[in-house]
């Protein structure tokens, strides 16, 4: 299953994301499509006040769209284009490049963990289906800063 996860390069998923800071916590529902490093997108489904916001990566360009306000912005040669901790392939790349990447099986789950660039990421996978269930991204103090719950996952590769 670990090799299966590490070979994913195209998928669609619907995730619940909780981002925690010192003072508050924000929750989002996001639809992600990933078709390789050059073609991926995220669309906010909830909360309603930012629903319809899309972040689309096309090659080295980043396009932001807000369908509710009929706005589009394009950023060419955007240098932080691949810096997206929320997507599954970001975890996969960090796992492959991380010196302290490891996995274990516990209670019917495969738990993959990596610690790269001061970010500890833990991915929990159902051992029977091979589908990701949740990911935790911890800050320097080992507190969960981002919690991602995979609601729907469709792997294309």
Language-model regions: role of each:
Residues 102-157:
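Gly/Pro-enriched, hydrophobic low-complexity segments
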Residues 34-86:
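An acidic-aromatic
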Residues 8-10, 33-40, 56-61, 106-107, ...:
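Short, solvent-exposed coil/turn segments at beta-strand boundaries
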Residues 1-38, 157:
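N-terminal leader/targeting segments and the immediate start of mature chains
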Residues 24-30, 51-57, 117-119, 144-147:
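Amphipathic hydrophobic-ligand
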Residues 66-118:
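Non-cytosolic head/periplasmic domains of membrane-anchored proteins
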Residues 17-21, 34-38, 46-48, 127, ...:
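Beta-strand elements of well-folded, non-transmembrane domains
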């Amino acid at each position: 299953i670990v090799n299966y996860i590490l070979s994913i390069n195209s998928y669609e998923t619907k995730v619940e994301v909780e981002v925690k800071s010192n003072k508050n916590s924000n929750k989002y529902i996001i639809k992600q499509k990933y078709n390789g490093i050059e073609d991926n997108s995220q669309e906010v489904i909830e909360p309603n006040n930012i629903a319809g916001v899309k972040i689309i990566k096309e090659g080295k360009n980043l396009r932001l769209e807000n369908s509710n306000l009929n706005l589009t912005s394009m950023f060419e040669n955007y240098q932080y284009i691949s810096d997206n901790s929320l997507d599954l392939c970001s975890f996969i790349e960090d796992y492959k490049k991380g010196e302290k990447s490891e996995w274990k099986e516990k209670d019917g789950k495969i738990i993959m963990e990596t610690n790269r660039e001061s970010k500890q990421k833990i991915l929990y996978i159902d051992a029977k289906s091979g589908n990701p269930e949740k990911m935790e991204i911890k800050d320097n103090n080992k507190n969960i800063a981002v919690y991602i719950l995979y609601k729907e996952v469709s792997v294309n590769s």
